[in-house]
């Protein structure tokens, strides 16, 4: 017998079966992700005095030039960045610490994890309505509890200096349970023998956390950070219901401004320009986080 040829190995036949299985996912991505992004990019190079497509005219990068001279847009983008930082500092860090504490609780950890995940199941609109009542300076229980312990209540959603933090607390309350579950899943893949070896070497609890847990949870941390960045940058519904960007636009984010320009004013091209810039910022931040983690992995 002669040596097998590339045709004998099946390389000459086109196997369509894998493409059939991934076709639904590709169609979904094409229709709901890539087409809207491409459409927004195209719209951003046009403008219309009436908002109708038949009145579109080419402006090139005119919308982008106007956008970066728009102080309100830049202020909204700044609020988005602050929101990202708060979302990393509060729910992500809290979720990681709770996951580590629950890791050694045996069967009860699933019960606690389920309890922590309950806020994640509450719709953002419902959460915003409930927390508006909690924050209410007249009838809300938060100020009432503060007064009981001798502290002064505050108009949480009417104070420009704290409103963004107050609204972010609502989002953090809803989101931290998701972080707990992801980190708990990652902790299941860490062998207990590594902790035993660290104890033998004299490592304390903090040393085990920083030199065993954190490095081995790197993939889970990257996923949560990227997911948090994407979710925080396009946040909209909770702020829309809780404050509608007020007071005095102190809690306005880019998503809310896109809604105002498109749905209220009919400036779809300008809103599309904002969407394009927001997409670029999200991709840039995500790439920075991923590259930083990958670089650290290569150095290790």
Which residue ranges define each predicted feature?
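Membrane-interfacial, low-structure loops and terminal tails that flank and connect transmembrane helices
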Residues: 2-8
């Amino acid at each position: 017998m002669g040596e097998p040829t590339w045709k004998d190995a099946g390389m000459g036949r086109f196997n369509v079966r894998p493409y059939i299985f991934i076709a639904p996912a590709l169609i979904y991505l094409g229709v709901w992700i890539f087409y809207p992004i491409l459409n927004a990019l195209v719209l951003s190079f046009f403008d219309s005095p009436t908002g109708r497509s038949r009145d579109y005219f080419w402006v090139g990068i005119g919308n982008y030039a106007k956008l970066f001279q728009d102080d309100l847009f830049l202020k909204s983008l700044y609020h988005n960045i602050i929101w990202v930082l708060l979302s990393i500092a509060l729910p992500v860090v809290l979720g990681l610490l709770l996951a580590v504490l629950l890791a050694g609780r045996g069967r009860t950890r699933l019960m606690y994890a389920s309890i922590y995940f309950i806020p994640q199941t509450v719709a953002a609109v419902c959460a915003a309505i409930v927390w508006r009542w909690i924050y209410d300076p007249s009838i809300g229980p938060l100020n009432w509890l503060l007064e009981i312990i001798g502290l002064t209540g505050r108009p949480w959603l009417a104070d420009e200096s704290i409103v963004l933090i107050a609204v972010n607390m609502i989002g953090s309350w809803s989101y931290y349970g998701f972080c707990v579950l992801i980190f708990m899943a990652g902790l299941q893949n860490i062998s207990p023998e590594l902790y035993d070896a660290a104890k033998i070497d004299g490592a304390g609890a903090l040393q085990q956390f920083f030199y065993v847990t954190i490095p081995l949870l790197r993939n889970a941390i990257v996923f949560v950070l990227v997911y948090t960045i994407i979710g925080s940058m396009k946040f909209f519904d909770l702020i829309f219901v809780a404050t509608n960007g007020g007071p005095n636009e102190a809690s306005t984010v880019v998503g809310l401004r896109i809604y105002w320009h498109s749905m209220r004013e009919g400036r779809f091209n300008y809103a599309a320009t904002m969407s394009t810039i927001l997409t670029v910022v999200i991709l840039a931040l995500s790439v920075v986080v991923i590259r930083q983690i990958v670089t650290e992995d290569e150095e290790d």
